[in-house]
């Protein structure tokens, strides 16, 4: 749970982009061209910050900077804000600078001025250039950004949004997530005019109250994720040293259309702890393959994870069916316990095996015996609140039985963050030791069954 009065050290709103950081938080807008390009709503961010000070007891400040004035150190400008109406592009040097800044813990917010399609298209194109390996994806309603302060499941739009063809009442926010953290966010419809306080029905925008609530949530989320991002970065560096460690038994992470890699360090860390815990002279080589690739049959275990909804092609489903029916094990987890992936995974596996059930694995199963005797696991604070305040609970793994052995093992709660010893503040997951023990036991099961 994030303290609702937490102060973000510094906010920098750039005229080309905008930044947020901490103490008596200062923000900055980045300057480029004349005011019409970056400052059509000059009081937008300031109004939001002033309202936050009076209504949610959060103290932020803002300043305006050019991109060249933005520090690559997120401690100096933790959040950047960029708004506009027209096409734009970064230079290769700016893209490299932004990528490093974002991976080191920074965050950038893009606001489409009056729902501008040219500006939105430019953001989508540039983020693909900056993060070719991680697609921009629309956030579903259970994402922590929509619940970090207010519960924002539904919003109010202007008539112009309806005339543009959008009929929903949920917020339309897209993001690039790295290691379970939003690093870049784009609002498809304009938030800034709502913060400014004046909204006309022929503008593609959120109504003021909805814009304010979304803005508060975004900044509260950014604040709570700052310190955590440092730990996640350290875990990634540690994982880099582990890649060459294993070379014997292949474990394959499933690649699919969407964000299939939510954590970069967790799996390698867990694989190393398995060797240390068991003393078994088996090293794991980690591969990343699509289900349609023949190489999956060289791996006794497939690992699959994600945050949001996904779909597999009929070819991928047929290949996965063949793999499991021939003795392979699919181990999947809903990273951070996100409900979008949970629903999609259950629908997918049921469509492949309609006559079978994904049942909860009983506590007396061998799966919970070796190499760790597991009767209960610790949970994250988010999951604790759902279980009536219990800090520990029986492990919840689900399995699909194939002739006396599990061909599918699934966790609806996040494990990978625990493997990295850095669960997200918003995760519905298992704590560090519990996640490692479950992961080790699943690996042992795959080797012995």
Would you name each region that the model predicts?
Residues 56-68, 110-114, 133-142, 228-234, ...:
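Surface-exposed patches in mature extracellular/periplasmic domains of secreted proteins
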Residues 24-79, 83-87, 191-192, 198-301, ...:
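Aromatic-Pro/Gly-enriched surface loop or interdomain linker
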Residues 71-76, 101-103, 176-180, 243-246, ...:
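Extracellular/periplasmic catalytic domains that process cell-envelope and extracellular macromolecules
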Residues 26, 32-36, 46-47, 117-197, ...:
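An acidic, glycine-rich "communication" segment
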Residues 6, 79-120, 301-342:
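Short alpha-beta junction capping motif
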Residues 3, 7-11:
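Short, low-complexity intrinsically disordered segments enriched in A/P/G/S/L with frequent Arg
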Residues 11-12, 20-25:
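Cleavable N-terminal signal peptides
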Residues 78-82, 107-111, 136-138, 183-186, ...:
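Structural recognition of the beta-strand scaffold that forms the well-ordered cores
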